[in-house]
């Protein structure tokens, strides 16, 4: 395979992985540990 193809595949997998991790952190199990600054400072 050409180096450009391998780099493209690697970058694509990396971006999909980062996006998946961000979605898991935002909506998965770890989201229960996230703090909400708006709820902390209700007036």
UniProtKB/Swiss-Prot annotation:
Protein keywords: Chloroplast, Membrane, Plastid, Thylakoid, Transmembrane, Transmembrane helix
A Pfam cross-reference name: PsbN
Ranges that cross the membrane: 7-27
Keyword Transmembrane helix applies: yes
Membrane topology: Single-pass membrane protein
Intracellular or extracellular location(s): Plastid, Chloroplast thylakoid membrane
Domain of life: Eukaryota
Entry-linked InterPro entries: PSII_PsbN
GO cellular component: chloroplast thylakoid membrane
GO biological process: photosynthesis
The UniProt record lists the keyword Membrane: yes
PANTHER family recorded: PROTEIN PSBN (PTHR35326:SF3)
Family: Belongs to the PsbN family.
Role summary: May play a role in photosystem I and II biogenesis.
Name the record gives this protein: Protein PsbN
Organism: Klebsormidium bilatum
Biological classification of the source: Eukaryota, Viridiplantae, Streptophyta, Klebsormidiophyceae, Klebsormidiales
Gene encoding the protein: psbN
């Amino acid at each position: 395979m050409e180096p450009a193809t391998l780099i493209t595949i690697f970058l694509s997998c990396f971006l999909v992985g980062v996006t998946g991790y961000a979605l898991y952190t935002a909506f998965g199990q770890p989201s229960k540990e996230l703090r909400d600054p708006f709820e902390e400072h209700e007036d």
